[in-house]
């Protein structure tokens, strides 16, 4: 058997295999013999048809069987011989039909892990966002809580203003695009929340009860149907009801409705603490992304498309699950699955590269996970609940895969900590995050 390996890229190989004619002949005869035992041809009992007739009528079946058998018998031994480990199923690139007396030739494309030789990974320069307390953000959160507790009171006289909630019947059309026509009855619309198409909100303001009005809007540039971007659309709206939001008074009684607060001052204090915790966690996550990006920049590598594809699938499933929990879908975001994969391919590739480089760093620096590390992680998950801690330990003791995943996570965390301990971290305001670091 002859085997030729061609390097297509650092992570892709073409393997060409030629199986000698003698072996092909043997497999063909073996295949026909097996087919003959099961063959049913007119005028003959099962398994009693002459071999020559079997060869005539079952040639395609023989070719399928022998090609598959020779492929399976030769490809993986050839890969083992050349120490090639595919990261995904090999893909047939070229294959010839099997013929008596002729060598069987085929080629397959495989993807392999990149060879990683870490270069510069100490002294990486990264920026870290400086945490800044923001009283306005806390007050904004309190206002949103008031909005959620607002009562709607009917408005009998007057016209539509910002902040009002309307009940309308409507129809919508884009001239020249009949498939876009739609309509609805008793639709609830809030004016002033920034969610309406450009022009619609302005057209609703000033309408009176019972009024019917044509409102021209401009279709947004990011419309899922690209043909409609920038085109005019017309809403015909009949205003059936106007309601005005009545916000609750901002006092201790309001704060107590949320259960966690005793007074309005207590609410502000605890919301400030919660926001600080959330912001510090966000900054930590952003810093992790930045240090990995810096590592990739200093250690560029190519990664297999199949690994990136799996990462995009993983990200897509996570997004779909999150949206499902919010009663939303990809379509409601103007995306489909293929569009998502295309849009986030670069992000997925970056995640794969970062993961491989971090794994290489773990090996190079002999980063290990001790039992104390696992105990600390168990305690973190249990959050002070002793009964929960006991159950967590029992679970991870019994579930090897879950325990291995936790070990991998801890190794990654320790590798990131190592990178940051050995990095030049510059703390800056949020507005300066994407400006070049001095010396770059």
From Swiss-Prot:
What is the superkingdom listed in this entry's lineage? Bacteria
Q: Which reaction does it catalyse?
A: [protein]-peptidylproline (omega=180) = [protein]-peptidylproline (omega=0)
What keywords tag this UniProt record? Cell cycle, Cell division, Chaperone, Cytoplasm, Isomerase, Rotamase
Top-tier EC class: isomerase
GO CC terms for this protein? cytoplasm
User: Is the keyword Repeat assigned to this protein?
Assistant: no
Q: Which cell locations does it reside in?
A: Cytoplasm
Citing just one GO molecular function, the answer is:
protein folding chaperone
Its domain description in UniProt is:
Consists of 3 domains; the N-terminus binds the ribosome, the middle domain has PPIase activity, while the C-terminus has intrinsic chaperone activity on its own.
- What protein name is recorded for this chain? Trigger factor
Species source reads Trichlorobacter lovleyi (strain ATCC BAA-1151 / DSM 17278 / SZ) (Geobacter lovleyi)
């Amino acid at each position: 058997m002859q085997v030729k390996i061609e390097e297509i890229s650092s992570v892709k190989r073409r393997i060409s295999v030629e199986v000698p004619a003698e072996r092909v002949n043997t497999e063909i005869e073996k295949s026909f013999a097996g087919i003959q035992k099961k063959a049913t041809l007119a005028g003959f009992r099962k398994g009693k048809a002459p071999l020559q007739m079997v060869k005539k009528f079952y040639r395609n079946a023989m070719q399928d069987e022998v090609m598959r058998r020779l492929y399976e018998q030769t490809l993986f031994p050839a890969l083992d011989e050349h120490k090639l480990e595919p990261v995904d199923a090999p893909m047939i690139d070229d294959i010839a039909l099997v013929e008596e007396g002729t060598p069987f030739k085929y080629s397959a494309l495989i993807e392999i892990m990149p060879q990683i030789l870490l270069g510069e990974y100490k002294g990486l320069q990264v920026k870290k966002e400086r945490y800044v307390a923001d009283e306005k953000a806390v007050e904004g959160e309190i206002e949103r809580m008031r909005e959620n507790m607002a009562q709607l009171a009917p408005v009998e006289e007057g016209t539509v203003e910002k902040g009002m909630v309307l009940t309308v019947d409507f129809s919508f059309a884009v001239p020249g695009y009949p498939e876009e026509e739609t309509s609805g009855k008793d639709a609830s619309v809030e004016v002033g929340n920034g969610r309406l198409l450009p022009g619609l909100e302005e057209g609703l303001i000033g309408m009176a009860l019972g009024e019917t009005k044509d409102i021209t809007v401009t279709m947004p540039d990011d419309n899922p149907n690209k043909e409609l971007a920038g085109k005019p659309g017309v809403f015909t709206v009949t205003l059936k009801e106007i309601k005005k939001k009545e916000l609750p008074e901002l006092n201790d009684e309001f704060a107590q409705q949320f259960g966690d607060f005793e007074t309005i001052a207590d609410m502000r204090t605890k919301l400030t603490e919660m926001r600080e915790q959330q912001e510090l966690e966000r900054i930590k996550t952003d810093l992790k992304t930045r240090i990995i990006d810096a590592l990739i920049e200093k250690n560029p590598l190519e990664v297999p498309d199949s690994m990136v594809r799996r990462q995009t699938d993983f990200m897509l499933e996570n997004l779909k699950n999150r949206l499902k929990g919010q009663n939303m879908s990809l379509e409601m975001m103007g995306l489909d699955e293929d569009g998502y994969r295309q849009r986030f391919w670069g992000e997925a590739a970056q995640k794969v590269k970062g993961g491989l480089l971090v794994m290489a760093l773990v090996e190079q620096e002999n980063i290990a996970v001790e039992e104390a590390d696992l105990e600390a992680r168990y305690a973190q998950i249990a959050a002070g609940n002793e009964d929960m801690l006991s159950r967590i330990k029992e679970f991870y003791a019994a579930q090897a895969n879950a325990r291995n995943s936790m070990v991998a996570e801890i190794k990654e965390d320790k590798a990131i900590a190592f990178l940051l301990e050995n990095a030049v971290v510059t703390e800056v305001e949020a507005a300066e995050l994407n400006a070049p670091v001095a010396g770059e």
